[in-house]
Amino acid sequence: HTDFFTSIGHMTDLINTEKDLVISKLKDYIKAEESKLEQIKKWAEKLDKLTDTATKDPEGFLGHPANAFKLMKRLNTEWGELESLVLKDMSDGFISNMTIQRQFFPNDEDQTGARKALLRLQDTYNLDTDTLSRGNLPGVKHKSFLTAEDCFELGKIRYTEADYYHTELWMEQALKQLDEGEVSSADKVYILDYLSYAVYQQGDLSKAMMLTKRLLELDPEHQRANGNMKYFEYIMAKEKEANKSSTDAEDQTDKETEVKKKDYLPERRKYEMLCRGEGLKMTPRRQKRLFCRYYDGNRNPRYILGPVKQEDEWDKPRIVRFLDIISDEEIETVKELAKPRLSRATVHDPETGKLTTAHYRVSKSAWLSGYESPVVSRINTRIQDLTGLDVSTAEELQVANYGVGGQYEPHFDFGRKDEPDAFKELGTGNRIATWLFYMSDVSAGGATVFPEVGASVWPKKGTAVFWYNLFPSGEGDYSTRHAACPVLVGNKWVSNKWLHERGQEFRRPCTLSELE
């Protein structure tokens, strides 16, 4: 497996691997080392008593021929055996096992991906560093703490990205935990070095000087800190003369740039607000248009006597949710079929029309065909019956499992006019509609949001949502731009069916209006 961080499902395998290493391999190695040490200790204790007696009366001791013989034997043979025992490497078995297992361990990319996921969650859900570090997240079953070293590492990631605001937050958290007495390999001098520079870059000169002074108290010979201190004093003197800080001017420029960037990316703010549940609140008048009902698939014979529960989630675009539409047994079957095939989820490259991985889609997916399992075939039939659309031209059922902070940033499911080759290889036209199963509950986060209209749809196991991506005319509905929010706590499994235009000519015909 690769890209472990993109799938919680695959990361569970790592827990079992680690347990096996600890229980059978590492403990066996410890026992072997303890046994070896015990033999050496017994030898030392025996010789301690013997030499203590012998040195009190060497001639009398050696006057006994057996003692003389045993001395010769010990020095010639037994000390050599002890040397061999000391030199015996008990780690061979453990090391060989480790070498085999490490082939399947996460790599640097996985560690970086997990680090970035934590930072992404912090931004999206407005979490302060103390909340993340103390593990005080909603719905957690197993609380976990970040060490000062962990906080320092996260701060360094932000530093390399020139994000000095978050660098300051994480370095301060690391320093706080060390000041509270946490024992760590993290060094206060290193932390203060990064922290003072991050604070200076944001224009707070007096705080930068205070932190640098504290650093110099710990390490008076620190070259960079001494140089920085002189520079800060020079800048401070210039401030007093001009009564205006050039640093403040730089800070103001940074702030203006930041505001421009934020204004330039309004969708990002909408997306994050929706993920936090701060979305658009429907007016009572609009809410009255939303209903729940028993739905029989337009008099479909399979559902006339046993209609399904359907709820309106949104009016424009129309998003409906089907409740109790997939059983726990079906979910487990789909997951078991998909797990061995899960690979890093891809997106369509608009320039090449080919599939490629992307940093904004953090999940793993697998494709299941109807002929592989009666369960998948039954699910496909159910989708066809309830949507009234032909699934023979649809894509295979895609199963996705999200990773650490797993997400899929805002995107369209359909190919736009400037992407004429998006689904050319399939030969079935554009994606007319999307059917999305939620196959797990998520403790926190993981909503499906529509930034253009302000809709948030929250995961609920056993339900499915459905919407049309195209108008009856075949034009794309740009209000269906949507995203999967980062998973804050939990393990998110979904499966989706993309239905295509071909085969729907008489099932969803064009209307008389060009605008629809």
Curated annotation (Swiss-Prot):
Assigned keywords, A-Z: Dioxygenase, Endoplasmic reticulum, Glycoprotein, Iron, Metal-binding, Oxidoreductase, TPR repeat, Vitamin C
GO biological process: collagen fibril organization
Superkingdom of this protein's organism: Eukaryota
Segments annotated as TPR repeats: 189-222
UniProt catalytic activity: L-prolyl-[collagen] + 2-oxoglutarate + O2 = trans-4-hydroxy-L-prolyl-[collagen] + succinate + CO2
Residue ranges constituting the Fe2OG dioxygenase domain according to the UniProt record: 393-501
Co-factor note (free text): Binds 1 Fe(2+) ion per subunit.
Protein task: Catalyzes the post-translational formation of 4-hydroxyproline in -Xaa-Pro-Gly- sequences in collagens and other proteins.
Subunit structure: Heterotetramer of two alpha chains and two beta chains (the beta chain is the multi-functional PDI).
Protein name, as recorded: Prolyl 4-hydroxylase subunit alpha-1
Species for this entry: Gallus gallus
Taxonomic lineage: Eukaryota, Metazoa, Chordata, Craniata, Vertebrata
Gene field: P4HA1
